[in-house]
């Protein structure tokens, strides 16, 4: 009987990757990360280890090195074609070789190859990168270390050269054969209020009395079976800031990396505006591929993605303003649309749309988003109704560049709000289609509710944004600014503006200060934010600001090797090689020439297993015979296609979980019992949620009809409800609408962010229609806030008995009617 010792995969192969250690340094709004992969070959033959992993597409990878038997081997960034050739040649000569590259078809997927790893050899491979930290809606900065890489569907014309084509072993999450350790140091002039995480962390340690520096770490033995998320809350996040960084001494003074570089950050506190009567064309593009049958989480009774998507569509439809236009597309291998073209928002069209939403299913096969996108863009625009596109997908598309390019080509006539569903959604796809069109991107993971995220973005779409944005600089004579970031025409409420610029000319010797002024308009009113800063550049060994600026320039020009011109490719190559930041045209390669053992036969190839979110749809990749391009006959390409891509069956289905963030200040471990109870109470099948049933009944204009369907939800009879109406001769819909709004406050408070917009529409309708032609009798006087019409009743009634005190409701309703008449 054969025995397998050590860590093995489900295929009985020993795993060369033993652990991953991450050192994270967060300074204000940016993060510097060093990730070390520890390999050991326990086999009796030389091997080549390949590790395919996801990384946020905004990450600027700038360093790759290996430590072998105490010797450091630093990789060089080269043209990708040359790097591949050098790697292959080194292996053929018996040298040890290392290769790190970005995938040809997706900017957020990387592969790390360790070639000719001799028996008994231990190697530590370290890659370093920097990135901007995105903002959450509540002002938190979010750092995400992604663990899950979903299977990605391939476009028909795609080459098999992608590392996504590699058959990656799947193992049960609890048996994942490597661990993760992470230490995070956080420093901010804004002051650190608290830190939260979805994983078990050590108690937070403040390193300074003023709480401007802190440290946290993952608890020992953490399995890399879920995305690791940190949420950092600063005390004064809206304060503008400017940081100036010294350039490299060995670079030309006026070059990208030689000149001082400034990063300007504005996070304006834009007031919320009631925008219930906003014109626009709202198109919702919903993923209906087989992967949408995947549960949102692994907990028992977790809601399916498609069910959450249907609820989300319903809430979005009910929250749209009267007078707008809308349409809904579903896409998979093919696509369907509700209407031939966008229709006006009326009671008839909304009723038809709601009925069709109820019948939606994840039944359209694979993921092909380009065709419906092109159909949307070729449709004639509606005068006076700018297009707002909402895209929902789990991101399982390989060729993200083609999709991004299509959105960018049409960016001047629309905004795109994108949503990545589940762990493993492509950050490259989701972020870039929003970025190039001036919209926003959201990721729905762990216990995030798709409904809440989508309604939050709709609020942004309905809000008045900052327009006519311009920057002006106040600098000493002789010093000028070269803007590296293009102009951003608008800033939405909750968005942050980060700008990169070069300072050219002689820097002042003595202490001197400059200033930046951001001018903009809000609803026709001119406003400005001004911040002063020191002109003495600070040294930074990582050159974080310079490399983030270089990454920004690369992102604006690099749409993949198959989508850019020769001139654009040349520009990207120059920026990448000058800054040391990885691009789709470059790769890191390192050779250990001290090892000179000729390889006898092919190296044993080992692909490191990852936690995978399997789908219910079979996915097939092209065979190796269809390879094209400069690597057609290379050994690396032959390795990538050693086996056809095997569809995942039910027997290998593994889901990754992500519990809700738990505060770690004063505690290190989240309460698992609370998580369990929350997950059990949260899920309802589509249509079973009573709050949703009430929302189903709302009319397009925001009102509710007084009928038995409504009173059944309210827990009373139609006769009793009519008898309790304080305005017997008025419109009964006013009474029904008041009761519906009160019921939502009493019974759906935990989901308020999801029905807040449709409540505003209801209140606006009451303001225009309630109490016409009525003369209400005297009633007790009390203060009523127009934004909180139910507080009086809620203070006097219990949730389960709220309709039993109809006299209070009558009194409140009379006050409401008078208030709206005024």
UniProtKB/Swiss-Prot annotation:
| SMART domains membership | VIT (SM00609), VWA (SM00327)
InterPro entries in alphabetical order: VIT (IPR013694), VWF_A (IPR002035), vWFA_dom_sf (IPR036465)
Organism domain of life: Eukaryota
Renumbered to this chain, region (Disordered) spans: 657-682
Question: Per the record, where are the segments of Polar residues compositional bias?
Answer: 669-680
In the UniProt record, does the keyword Repressor occur?
no
Q: In this protein, which residues make up the domain named VWFA?
A: 281-469
The protein's matches in Gene3D superfamilies, at most eight in alphabetical order, are given as: von Willebrand factor, type A domain (3.40.50.410)
The keyword DNA repair is assigned to this record: no
Q: Which residues form the VIT domain?
A: 1-131
PROSITE patterns, A to Z:
VIT, VWFA
Question: In the record, which residues are listed under signal peptide?
Answer: none
Per its UniProt record, what Pfam families does this chain match?
VIT, VWA_3
Keyword list (alphabetical) reads: Tumor suppressor
**Record function comment:** May play a role in tumorigenesis as a tumor suppressor. Altered expression of this protein and disruption of the molecular pathway it is involved in may contribute directly to or modify tumorigenesis.
| Full protein name | von Willebrand factor A domain-containing protein 5A
Tell me what organism the protein belongs to: Rattus norvegicus
